[in-house]
């Protein structure tokens, strides 16, 4: 299972978190976000990370040309589209950067929101389900109703996000079986500043889950 920590802004924290067993680190490329990093900061952050760590840029309602420039400057391996991007834009991005992993985030209000997934399954590499918030695009701490996701079985891998933290991850993974998890505010002191003790608590909880007979 992929483990993604999102909203990094500090080099020392990114390097420390990269060592504890996560697979991907996410960086917010949306200017209105309190976790925003500039393209120059992004390049500095990604250059400091090991090659095996996925470097995910999070975008929202940005132009194709803007995304391509940031992806190139930031040496990103993955683009996560967290706004209202169309399947057509996803396809255009894939045509321009066939080497790039594309994740489409869907902001889930209720079970009906899951129907949007079908539109993207043929044009992205993975989906990410986050809780809907009218004011923020992510990192809200709001939780999806997990009961709505029990039958979710898309044709591509998917990440569970939305209010996950070290205290509820075992319950979440006891009910659902995503291909990856994504945490931001659940392992923070404040927006963009991670709490390394919470990240370690998350990894400890995941190790305990993995050691259970059902997951062995």
UniProtKB/Swiss-Prot annotation:
What is catalysed by this protein?
A: N-(5-phospho-beta-D-ribosyl)anthranilate = 1-(2-carboxyphenylamino)-1-deoxy-D-ribulose 5-phosphate
Q: Which UniProt keywords apply?
A: Amino-acid biosynthesis, Aromatic amino acid biosynthesis, Isomerase, Tryptophan biosynthesis
Entry's EC annotation: 5.3.1.24
Entry's Gene Ontology molecular function annotations: phosphoribosylanthranilate isomerase activity
Question: What enzyme class is recorded for this protein?
Answer: isomerase
The GO biological-process annotations, alphabetized, read as: L-tryptophan biosynthetic process
Which protein family is it in?
Answer: Belongs to the TrpF family.
Q: What is this protein called?
A: N-(5'-phosphoribosyl)anthranilate isomerase
The organism named in the record is Picosynechococcus sp. (strain ATCC 27264 / PCC 7002 / PR-6)
The organism's taxonomy opens as: Bacteria, Bacillati, Cyanobacteriota, Cyanophyceae, Oscillatoriophycideae
């Amino acid at each position: 299972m992929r483990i993604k920590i999102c909203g990094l802004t500090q080099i020392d924290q990114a390097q420390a978190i990269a060592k504890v067993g996560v697979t991907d680190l996410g960086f917010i490329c949306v200017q209105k976000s309190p976790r925003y990093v500039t393209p120059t900061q992004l390049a500095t952050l990604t250059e400091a990370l090991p090659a095996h760590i996925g470097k995910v840029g999070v975008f929202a309602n940005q132009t194709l040309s803007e995304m391509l420039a940031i992806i190139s400057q930031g040496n990103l391996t993955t683009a996560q589209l967290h706004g209202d991007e169309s399947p057509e834009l996803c396809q255009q991005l894939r045509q321009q950067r066939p080497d790039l992993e594309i994740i489409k985030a869907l902001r889930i209000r209720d079970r009906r929101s899951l129907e949007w997934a079908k539109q993207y399954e043929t044009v992205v590499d993975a989906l990410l389900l986050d809780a809907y918030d009218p004011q923020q695009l992510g990192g809200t701490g709001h939780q999806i109703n997990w009961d709505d996701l029990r039958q979710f079985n898309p044709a591509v891998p998917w990440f569970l996000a939305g209010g996950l933290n070290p205290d509820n991850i075992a319950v979440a993974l006891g009910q659902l079986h995503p291909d990856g998890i994504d945490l931001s505010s659940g392992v923070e002191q404040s927006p963009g500043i991670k709490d390394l003790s919470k990240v370690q608590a998350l990894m400890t909880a995941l190790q305990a889950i993995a050691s259970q007979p059902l997951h062995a």
